[in-house]
Amino acid sequence: MQRMDIKTASTLNALTSDFYTRCAASFAQTRTRPWHGWQRCLEALGDVMLSRQELSVLDLGCGTLRFEDFLAEHTHAHLNVYAVDSCEAFLENKHNVHFINLDIISTLWDDTFPSHLNDVPLCNLTCAFGLMHHIPGMHARIALLDTMLNKTTSGEYILISFWQFEHNERLSRKARTATATALERYPDLQLDESDWLLGWQDEADALRYCRSFTDAEIDTFVTHAADRAQLVDRFNAD
């Protein structure tokens, strides 16, 4: 049964936001290498896309812009990057980026998210890496997908990652422990199935909301987008 309510969503979002504010430096230090799956993404994009003189990229939940660094190494195109996130500390050394400081989750829940992107043009490439699992509530995740579809040039590409950490016994065990701790502190949380809290290193109070996606749930996203987009590739990596 799906039980997520706005009070729970707000609490989870606040915990995740606090996590990234407090742990930005140590978290970024562990996120310096490209994801293995990005190489396969490039293969899906193809040589024609990567050989263009200019590419526009909308990156939702951009983090440290690792993907753009990786993309720049594999194309000669000039990148026009529109980066959206709520943790500007990650971007202190980044330049030539149109940055939008935005609480994505809150605006998805109050239905204002698309309006914050009005100044962003249609892009050749729209991506959300490491974001979808931080969004509580299925309707909010679908709203993110809809916005990505609406902000992507027809015939171009959308890249999305869905974390499935319940397949990893070590992470699954950590999630169970951290979630039990969170529920002791916040007994009113109404979590959906496969909703978890995860901790971080030695930060006992640092908790972030993470959803572990099932294959069936990912199928739902594919089906939802089927009348507006064609699935090019789907794979497990990292």
Model-found features: residue ranges?
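A short, conserved alpha-helix within the catalytic core of class I
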Residues: I135-T147
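Short catalytic micro-motifs in class I SAM-dependent methyltransferases
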Residues: G130-H134
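Conserved helix-to-beta-strand junction in the class I
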Residues: T147-S154
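Class I (Rossmann-like) S-adenosyl-L-methionine-dependent methyltransferase catalytic domain
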Residues: Q2-L55, G63-S115, H139, Y157-D238
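Local beta-strand N-terminus motif with an aromatic residue
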Residues: E54, L122-C123
